[in-house]
């Protein structure tokens, strides 16, 4: 799923939990943080392979997303650190037991990790063979093979893309509507 859609989904879910006291920065950062390493790897790798190594753009894309994404330990680790359900569940459980319930539900880190986890849960069903590694770092290759993809036309992206676009527009419209209403709720 596209990163801006994650931000709108996570914001809407946080607002709908019935509390106005959630740390907005944690929710928003957690909604995009799982994708940030791949942005940096893609930009850095794209510039390096294109302008230092002199590769053609197609060659660069095939190498980065056909080889490095699936086989390079650095790429795998950085991309899955905040995308792995296993890592996020362990972190959330450890934080919960470390802080206790009352502090956990108000914790910036709890909201951040919860937002990363929601991002991951939304990603899993819309990535055919490039989704999060479910059991990383214990298993470095297992991904749920969804029949759907948000970008791959061979896996119904022609359906998923407009659905995601509609979700994005509806949630954005809802947020704008709430902000423009006199009472702001």
Cite the ranges covered by each PLM segment.
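N-terminal membrane-targeting hydrophobic helices
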Residues: 1-185
């Amino acid at each position: 799923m596209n990163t801006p859609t994650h931000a709108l989904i996570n914001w809407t879910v946080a607002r709908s939990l019935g509390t106005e006291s959630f740390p907005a920065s944690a929710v928003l950062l957690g909604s995009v943080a799982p994708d940030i390493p791949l942005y940096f790897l893609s930009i850095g790798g794209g510039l390096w392979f294109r302008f230092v190594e002199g590769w053609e753009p197609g060659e660069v894309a095939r190498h980065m997303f056909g080889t490095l994404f699936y086989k390079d330990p650095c790429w795998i680790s950085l991309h899955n650190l905040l995308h792995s359900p296993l890592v996020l569940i362990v972190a959330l459980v450890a934080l919960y037991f470390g802080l206790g319930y009352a502090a956990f539900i108000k914790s910036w880190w709890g909201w951040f990790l919860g937002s990363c986890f929601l991002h991951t849960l939304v990603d899993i069903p819309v990535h055919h063979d490039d989704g999060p590694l479910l059991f990383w770092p214990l298993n470095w290759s297992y991904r749920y093979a969804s029949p759907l993809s948000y970008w791959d036309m061979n896996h119904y992206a022609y359906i998923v893309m407009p659905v995601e676009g509609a979700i994005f527009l509806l949630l954005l419209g809802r947020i704008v509507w709430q902000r423009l209403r006199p009472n702001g709720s």
